[in-house]
């Protein structure tokens, strides 16, 4: 057992001091979401019928929209489904933002042969190093699954047969089935499924072990006067991979805003959601997948438009812009395919049609520069 060899004193400490032994508490993996009402499509339009995704998925009717506020009462089960289905990220949690969850799963998938995503009801014990526990597997959105599938092929869901049938979060199964199914179609890859805990493997990857071994051989003398350890070397390699991914996404956003502008014609700041950043990062990594990504965006018919401004008002990501000449333009990168603009347009000047997802691909400047240099040579 490589893990036991890496940390031989862990079990000894727990046996000597029972108070130090961790106890599984499902509440540790759950978190009540908070709302940024300024992003809500219903508050922006003063119409609760414009978007009902969070209300529809909530099994306890804990979410209400009152005037300009999104309210979450104490009946909330802390399942996280509302944040997963909200297109504008109005609802979110501090420990389970899309990029945080991506980093957590990517860190595990990079270090272990197999990464397991599961829920508190399924596991019922302290998770091992390669087990990511959520309040509900439906807490992961379609976009997050897509981003993970483009980068890793060793992610599985662990759910025993029938576990969802007895769950009070009755909308959870349908939510994760839809999210994973769509992500698999887009990524042309699949998420594994494990139903038997006895069949789960907890081995570190060969690359991770190799980095520890090489560090041990090279730095054996240095470790006498420093804190460098073989185990730390493997962790540092994984951390660098995650850090590089974050830097790549941040740089991609900078390039996007430089190309199309970070603000609308009325000087309002556009918002690129974390989920959309992950999708665009995945497409930058593998542009060939763009043709499989099925998203919608509003198409504008100027002959029907009265320039009332309702569409621009309801678009909280500011993807849609209505200029002083009465022309509507849509920046697809910022459009979350919510359809709210088309719903509030009484004249039918906006209709939702398939988006040209090629527009979501932001060329990597470094890669393009290297390609240009090779072409000259």
Task: Label each region the model flagged.
Residues 47-71, 77, 81-99, 310-327, ...:
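Iron-sulfur cluster-binding cysteine motifs and their immediate structural context
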Residues 1-57, 115-120, 200-206, 215-306, ...:
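Ferredoxin-type iron-sulfur electron-transfer modules and their immediate structural context
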Residues 1-32, 38, 42-47, 84-198, ...:
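Flanking helices and flexible, charged tails adjoining ferredoxin-like Fe-S electron-transfer domains
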Residues 336:
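Extended, alpha-helix-rich binding/interface surfaces that flank or overlap catalytic cores
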Residues 61, 137, 202:
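Glycine- and other small-residue-rich loops at beta-strand/loop junctions that grip anionic moieties
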């Amino acid at each position: 057992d490589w893990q036991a060899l890496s940390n031989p004193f862990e079990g000894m400490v727990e046996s000597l001091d029972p108070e130090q032994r961790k106890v599984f508490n499902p509440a540790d993996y759950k978190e009540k979401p908070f709302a940024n009402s300024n992003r809500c499509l219903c508050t922006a339009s003063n119409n609760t019928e414009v978007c009902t995704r969070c209300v529809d998925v909530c099994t306890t009717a804990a979410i209400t929209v009152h005037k300009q506020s999104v309210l979450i009462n104490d009946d909330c089960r802390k399942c996280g489904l509302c944040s997963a289905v909200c297109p504008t990220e109005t609802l979110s949690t501090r420990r389970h933002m899309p990029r945080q969850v991506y980093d957590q799963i990517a860190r595990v998938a990079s270090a272990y042969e197999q990464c397991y995503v599961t829920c508190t009801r399924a596991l019922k014990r302290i998770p091992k190093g390669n087990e990511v526990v959520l309040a509900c597997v439906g807490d992961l959105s379609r976009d997050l699954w897509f981003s993970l599938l483009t980068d890793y092929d060793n992610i599985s869901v662990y759910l025993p047969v029938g576990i969802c049938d007895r769950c009070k979060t009755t909308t959870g199964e349908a939510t994760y089935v839809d999210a994973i199914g769509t992500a698999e179609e887009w990524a042309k890859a699949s998420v594994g499924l494990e139903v038997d805990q006895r069949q789960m493997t907890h081995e570190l990857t060969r690359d991770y072990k190799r980095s520890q071994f090489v560090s041990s051989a090279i730095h054996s003398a240095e470790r006498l006067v420093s804190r460098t350890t073989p185990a730390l070397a493997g962790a540092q390699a994984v951390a660098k991979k995650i850090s590089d991914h974050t830097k790549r996404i941040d740089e991609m956003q900078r390039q996007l805003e430089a190309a199309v502008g970070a603000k609308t014609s009325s000087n309002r700041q556009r918002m690129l959601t974390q989920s959309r950043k992950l999708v665009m990062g995945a497409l930058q990594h593998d542009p060939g997948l763009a043709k499989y990504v099925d998203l919608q965006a509003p198409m504008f018919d100027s002959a029907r438009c009265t320039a009332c401004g309702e569409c621009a008002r309801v678009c909280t990501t500011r993807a849609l812009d209505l200029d002083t000449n009465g022309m509507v333009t849509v920046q697809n990168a910022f459009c979350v395919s919510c359809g709210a603009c088309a719903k509030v347009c009484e004249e039918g000047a906006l209709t939702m049609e398939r988006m040209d997802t090629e527009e979501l691909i932001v060329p990597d400047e470094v890669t393009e520069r290297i390609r240009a240099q090779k072409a000259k040579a």
